[in-house]
């Protein structure tokens, strides 16, 4: 339990560019913190009174948040987006059917592609589009419980209900092989690395094309 909701925190997300900005939810309530969790502001007053299943920040904009709902009802209230950290919300359910949405991730592309793990399959659209597209290449007809963007291999990975883990190429990205090797300058020991000492990470990939930009995420 916790004093924020009087119950368990069921979902949490941390902004990509500022780890002091985070969002947490319990059932239908959503709160935002900008001081690393010391204080929270509730931002769910205008959101549906339904169970929140997931939260995601836009990796390019910490003010943009998407929340998903796990309801079966014919209410067109499955996905909501805020561009001002919850001060106001926009319903972006659009053409999705009457099914629960289990998971949401946002890719670090120019268009900020949104992926949804749904009761049946995966759906995607860019941040600016108004239509969701089924993204189900070779995926079994099953519930997608969790999604994750795997930057090292340019793939979207999803866990399903009883049908294993599946992986497929991200949209809007040029394919390239996975990272071949990664090493750091000082291998961790009981005494290393010392605080304040820089660590250098070297990764090797095999690629024949020209790279205009490279995005690196340290997890």
Predicted regions and their residues:
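Conserved blade-ending motifs and adjacent loop-strand segments that build the rim/top face
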Residues: 49-50, 93-103, 132-151
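Blade-level signature of beta-propeller repeat domains, shared across WD40, Kelch, NHL, RCC1
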Residues: 142-173
């Amino acid at each position: 339990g916790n004093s924020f909701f009087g119950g368990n925190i069921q979902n949490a997300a941390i902004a990509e560019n500022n780890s002091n900005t985070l969002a947490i939810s319990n059932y239908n309530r959503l709160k935002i913190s900008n001081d690393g969790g010391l204080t929270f502001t509730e931002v769910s007053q205008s959101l549906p009174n339904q169970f929140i299943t997931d939260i995601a920040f836009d990796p390019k904009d910490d003010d943009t948040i998407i929340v998903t709902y796990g309801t079966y009802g014919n209410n067109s209230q499955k996905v909501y987006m805020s561009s001002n950290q919850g001060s106001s919300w926009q319903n972006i359910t659009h053409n999705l059917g009457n099914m629960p949405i289990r998971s949401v991730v946002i890719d670090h592309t120019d268009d900020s592609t949104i992926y949804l793990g749904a009761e049946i399959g995966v759906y995607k659209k860019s941040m600016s589009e108004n239509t969701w597209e089924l993204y189900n290449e070779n995926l079994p007809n099953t519930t997608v419980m969790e999604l994750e963007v795997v930057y090292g291999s340019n793939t979207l990975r999803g866990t399903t209900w009883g049908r294993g883990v599946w992986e497929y190429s991200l949209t809007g990205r040029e394919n390239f092989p996975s990272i071949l090797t990664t090493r750091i300058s000082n291998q961790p020991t009981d005494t290393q690395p010392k605080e304040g000492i820089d660590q250098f990470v070297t990764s090797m990939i095999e690629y024949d094309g020209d790279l205009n930009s490279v995005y690196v995420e340290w997890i």
